[in-house]
Every structure is written in C-alpha cells, then in structure tokens.
Regions:
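Thiamine diphosphate
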Residues: 110-121, 265-268, 292, 309-311, ...
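N-terminal alpha/beta PP-like core and its mobile active-site loop of ThDP/TPP-dependent enzymes
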Residues: 2-339, 382, 466-469, 501, ...
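Conserved short loop/turn motifs at secondary-structure junctions
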Residues: 219-223, 364-365, 446-448
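Active-site diphosphate/adenylate-binding microenvironment
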Residues: 11-15, 22, 29-32, 37-39, ...
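Generic enzyme active-site microenvironment
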Residues: 163, 300, 392, 444-445
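Phosphate/pyrophosphate-binding active-site segments
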Residues: 2-5, 141, 295-395, 519-528, ...
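A glycine-rich phosphate-binding loop feature that marks nucleotide/adenosyl-phosphate handling sites
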Residues: 165-170, 396-397, 543
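A structural motif corresponding to the C-terminal end of an alpha-helix
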Residues: 130, 378-387, 506-512
C-alpha cells in the first residue's frame, strides 16, 4: 500500500505543473480522456469552468490571456473536441493573445498506422498552421518541460496560441512520485523585456518633432502591454492626437480632448507622420493605402520585427516590447521636447465637432421600432454611469455602431471580434472577462452573432456570473427584411426568425429576461441587470430594415458581374 501511495500518473503531474506555474483557472469541456484531469485540478484548487462547446471555452481562455498577460488554459477532448477548439486557438494566435489549448488524444501507435483508434486524428500536425507552436508529450517525465515551453512560447515576443497534445496513455502512465516532482519546471521570467535600439528611439522622436500633423494610433498590442501611464504621459506631453483601435479604447478615455476618433477619416488622410503603437497596418487600417496620404511617414512600435514594412515602408521601426519602447521614448523626449502644432489640433477639433453634431442628430431621433442609433444611445447613457464594467461586442451593424457610439473610460475593458472579425466570441469572452475580473460584464450582441454561442447562457447561469447580454434583434443577418429570390416563401439567406424572444431563454436556466421596445425600457433593464449582478438577457426589438449589408465593411463583398 505504501509503495502505491508513492506512485503518480500523468494527469496528476500536469495538474501539479499548472499549479506550480500559478495557473488558477481552466476553461474546457470534459470527456475521454481528460475528465479525471479536470476533477483533480479542482481538488488541487484550480478553478474549472465547464462549457457547452470547446470553441467558447477557447475564447474565454484567450480573453483571460489578453486581460492578465498569463496564458489562458483551454482543455478539450480528442479529435472532434480538439477541432472545435481550434478556431479559438487560431483566433488567439492572429490577435496576439496568450493561450494554451491542452487536448487529450488517442494512442500514437494506432494513430500513426491509421488503424482506426477511438477519435483518431494527428492533432499536433493539424494544429501547427494555426498556433504559434504545437507540442506532443510522449512520456510522463516530459510533461513538466512541455508545459514550461508552452507557457514561455505563449507569452514571449508577440503572444499567441500554443497547442499541447497529451495522449491518453501518457495521462495514465505512472511514475514514482518523488521523481515526478523533480521533472516539473517553474517558468522564470517567461516574457523578458525586449529593449528597442536607442538609435531607433532617437530617430522616432526626431521625426515626430519635425511633423506638422502627427498622429498616434493605439492598437490592442498597446492595450495588452499595460503601458497605460507611459502612453498617457507621452501623448499629453507632446499633445499628439491619438486614434485608438477598438480594443485599445480606454487606454486614454474616449472623451479625452486629444482623441481623434470622431475625426478618424480626416486624421488618417491628412497626417504627415503616424506612430503605430502595437497596431498593424492590416485590413482594419486599409493596409495604410486607401484613404491615406501617399507621402505619410510611419513610425512603428512593435514587438515583432517581421511586422515592419508589411504594407507600407516604415521610416522608423522601433522593435521591442511596448512598455520598454515607451520608456525609451519618454527618456528621449526629455532631451528633445516638442509640442504638436496647435493648428493641427484645432482643425481636428473642428472636424470632431462637425461629426459629433451629425451623430447627435442620429442618436436623438425617436423611432418605433428602435434603430441601432437610438438604442445604442440608451446603452451609452447607462454605461457612462458604470465605467468599471467590461464590454464585449460582436455582430455586424451592432459591432460597428457600438464601437463608434459607446465611449470607454478604462483600459482593457472592451473585447470584440478583433483582427479576424470572427463571430461567436461573445459568450466566451464575456465568461472569460467575468471569471478573470470578478466585475460585471455587458455583452452587446447582434442576434445573428449571439446564435453562434448562445447555449453558453447555461454556463453563465450555472456559475451565476454577473453578465448582462443585450441582443439587438432585427430578425436577420445584417437586417431582417431580406427577400427570398426563389419566390417559394422560404426565408431569405439573411433572414432569421422574426419576433424571436431571446429573453425567454433565461426561463430555462433561472436567469432574468427582459423584452424591450423603447429606450426607457432599455435603460431600466440594463441598469437593473448590471446592479443585480444576475445573469440577464435583454431582447431589444430593432427595426428589421435597420442596418446595412455587412455593416461598415460592405465593400469587402465581391462584386457580381451579373446581379440577381
């Protein structure tokens, strides 16, 4: 009996390794061969959050990674469960969120000979194109070092998703307990500072000082860096206007006088020097081409050197982590002080005021049914009084309009579809943000977007999370007034069920539901949902004719030679 007590197995080893590396939460869906691993993690004090679908579990893990700078852990079963989680792993990698997906897998000896094992799949090689790295463990004594490598890879350099493959026979393999403990590695300084070249920093300050119309663009890499105070000090010292990308909103409050968000198009078209801080010149910024001046000069602060010159020539690359780079910029600024020309700030303010007036007219229009603008105006009123909440946002028109209308006041409080524009992140991100922060979360969802992960409301209710889900329901993908070209009475490809009552879903799970048709009802329901800290769905009835095809990115749809 005493000899048996001194033995351990792979699943106990991996849990102990997680514990020693201060991993306190696992998001997942259990089944063969990982159920007992989740049970043991709970027994060891690691919080396990069980989901209804692996994709949402992965999104929750990724959101946790973005908010904490520690890898979020997603646990899945083999093959189908692994594939369900793979979208979330790829999304984490594309967006630069640290995440580790741990999946059970089948016996390698059978899989490699394709002999038809239970849920047979070569998962490691399937994961490689979509992850920053993928590792498979073939013997229990390597579990500790494998997890250590996964942690370091996920958070060092540009963060991303890492896949860790744990075959069932490795989870069940035994080792002498004392020996097993010696194989566990506690990762030290997993994400060391990467200092920029001093000459690059000097050149960046010199170019900004000469600029007549400088602009700073803050990306979600800047938000992830948590260099909030350095960024604020630099912007306020130089008086350079800034433009936040959607998940960078709140690094400086959206109401800050130097925010150029309300004059975005004018600022991009007229800036002569643009400093990108943790932002990429990808499709979200028209690759730095359409809508930009041809002679704009770019400074780019990024941790990934391969990102430099990806679409436009970068006059001054500053390669390093954002916090170290901004520290260097501030130090150099003390030696070479400058202030942005007032005329540039004044002309931006004129355009901001003009656009704000146009938006005010849209927001103040009273319609029945509601449209996106007056409904979001009501949401904005409530969230202005609840600035600590975390906001999750997905959809087409719901996303695009909410991004422009709802102000953020604190960093890393907004989570949305990100670089990929992926739908289905809503409930996973909301759960991840709630579990990580303990704060109330408001998820503003298009009705189509909500459908991708809607069953996770059971997860929200099971854990009694303070999540309020606001569903903008216009009965369709983009809009709900599509016409079926077949003429046979079938729904159009973009139609959903009209007059759906999403609020009644909460009856099944003992949550709270509201159906609202006016702005006053919406304000009351949202305020009550936040203050009660109870799982809540608010079904907001929106005009089916409100919205546009694909929201603000209609132009990305291919043009037909012959229209239908």
């Amino acid at each position: 009996m005493s000899d048996q007590l001194q033995m351990t197995d792979g699943m106990h080893i991996i849990v102990e390794a997680l514990k020693q590396n201060n991993i306190d939460t696992i998001y997942g869906v259990v089944g063969i061969p990982v159920t007992d691993m989740a049970r043991h993690a709970q027994a060891e004090g690691i919080r396990y959050i069980g989901f209804r679908h692996e994709q949402s579990a992965g999104y929750a893990a990724a959101a946790s990674g973005f908010l904490t700078q520690k890898p979020g852990i997603c646990l899945t079963v083999s093959a189908p469960g692994f594939l369900n989680g793979l979208t979330a792993l790829a999304n984490a990698t594309v967006n630069g969120f640290p995440m580790i997906m741990i999946s059970g897998s089948s016996d390698r000896a059978i899989v490699d000979l394709q002999q038809g094992d239970y849920e047979e799949l070569d998962q490691m090689n399937a994961a490689k194109p979509y992850a920053k790295a993928a590792f498979r463990v073939n013997q229990p004594q390597d579990l500790g070092i494998a997890l250590a490598r996964a942690i370091r890879v996920s958070v060092s350099g540009r963060p991303g998703g890492v896949y860790l493959d744990l075959p069932a026979n490795v989870l069940a393999a035994t080792m002498e307990k004392d020996e097993a403990l010696t194989t566990i590695v506690k990762v030290e300084n997993p994400s060391p500072a990467l200092l920029p070249c001093p000459k690059s920093v000097t050149s960046a300050i010199s170019l900004l000082a000469k600029a007549e119309r400088p602009l700073i663009i803050l990306g979600k890499g800047a938000a992830y860096s948590q260099a909030d105070e350095q960024l604020r000090e630099f912007i306020e010292s130089t008086q350079i206007p800034f433009l936040p990308m959607s998940m960078a909103k709140g690094i400086l409050e959206d109401t800050h006088p130097l925010s150029a968000a309300a004059a975005r198009s004018f600022a991009l078209a007229n800036a002569d020097v643009v400093m990108l801080v943790g932002a990429r010149l990808n499709w979200l910024l028209a690759h730095g081409k359409k809508g930009w001046a041809a002679d704009t000069q770019f400074i780019q602060l990024d941790i990934e050197p391969q990102e430099i010159d990806s679409n436009r020539p970068i006059a001054v690359p500053v390669v390093g982590d954002i916090a170290s780079s901004m520290q260097g910029m501030l130090a150099e600024l003390k030696q070479n002080t400058f202030t942005t020309p007032l005329v540039w700030r004044d002309i931006l303010n004129i355009h901001k005021q003009q656009n704000a007036q146009k938006m005010h007219e849209k927001l103040s229009t009273d319609t029945q049914p509601l449209n996106y603008f007056n409904a979001l105006s009501a949401v904005r009123d409530v969230l202005r009084e609840n600035q600590d909440i975390y906001l999750v946002n997905e959809g087409a028109n719901t996303l695009d309009n909410a991004r422009n209308i709802i102000d953020m006041y604190k960093p890393r409080r907004r989570l949305d579809c990100g670089t990929w524009g992926v739908m289905g992140i809503g409930m996973g991100y909301a759960i991840g943000a709630s579990v990580t922060s303990g704060s109330p979360v408001v998820a503003i969802e298009g009705d189509s977007a909500f459908g991708f992960s809607g069953m996770e409301i059971e997860t929200i209710c099971r854990y009694n999370l303070p999540v309020t889900i606001v569903i903008f329901n216009n009965g369709g993908i983009y809009r709900g007034d599509g016409v079926a070209l077949s003429g046979a009475g079938a729904p159009s490809p973009t139609d959903l069920l009209h007059h759906a009552r999403y609020d009644k879903l909460m009856d099944a799970f003992r949550g709270v539901g509201y159906n609202v048709t006016t702005t006053d009802e919406l304000r009351h329901a949202l305020t009550t949902g936040i203050q009660s800290r109870k799982p809540t769905i608010i079904n907001v009835v929106i005009d089916p004719a409100a919205g546009t095809e694909s929201g603000h990115i209609t132009k990305l749809n291919p043009k037909q030679v012959a229209g239908n």
